UniProtKB/Swiss-Prot annotation:
Domain of life: Bacteria
Boundaries of every Sm domain copy: 10-69
SUPFAM superfamilies assigned to the protein according to its UniProt record, in alphabetical order: Sm-like ribonucleoproteins (SSF50182)
GO molecular function: RNA binding
Species of provenance: Acidovorax ebreus (strain TPSY)
InterPro entries: Hfq, LSM_dom_sf, Sm
Protein known as: RNA-binding protein Hfq
Disulfide bonds: none
UniProt lineage: Bacteria, Pseudomonadati, Pseudomonadota, Betaproteobacteria, Burkholderiales
Reported function: RNA chaperone that binds small regulatory RNA (sRNAs) and mRNAs to facilitate mRNA translational regulation in response to envelope stress, environmental stress and changes in metabolite concentrations. Also binds with high specificity to tRNAs.
GO BP annotations listed: regulation of DNA-templated transcription; regulation of RNA stability; regulation of translation, ncRNA-mediated
CDD domains, per database record: Hfq
CC per GO annotation: cytosol
Pfam families assigned to the protein according to its UniProt record, in alphabetical order: Hfq
TM region(s), chain numbering: none
């Protein structure tokens, strides 16, 4: 996975995990899973509800938070310029 993808995914998933935000995860086959993000890595998301499920990221279509989440994707300018 590219580094740019991680710059969006990691802060978003981390905010959902830290704030215990309920989420709906839609899979590419249309199945809807609900719960809270327990953990994640480059390939999987652990989703906790009554049980913990390991969901492979390649099977995920959409993640919908149950409420608004603030997460930072700010990165320093590549050329060191802060304009």
């Amino acid at each position: 996975m590219s580094n740019k993808g991680q710059l969006l995914q990691d802060p978003f998933l981390n905010a959902l995990r830290r704030e215990h935000v309920p989420v709906s995860i839609y899979l590419v086959n249309g199945i809807k899973l609900q719960g809270q993000i327990e953990s994640f890595d480059q390939y999987v998301v652990l989703l906790r509800n009554t049980v913990t499920q390991m969901v492979y990221k390649h099977a995920i279509s959409t993640i919908v938070p149950g409420r608004a989440v603030n997460f930072s994707t700010a990165e320093p300018a590549a050329d060191g310029d802060n304009q």
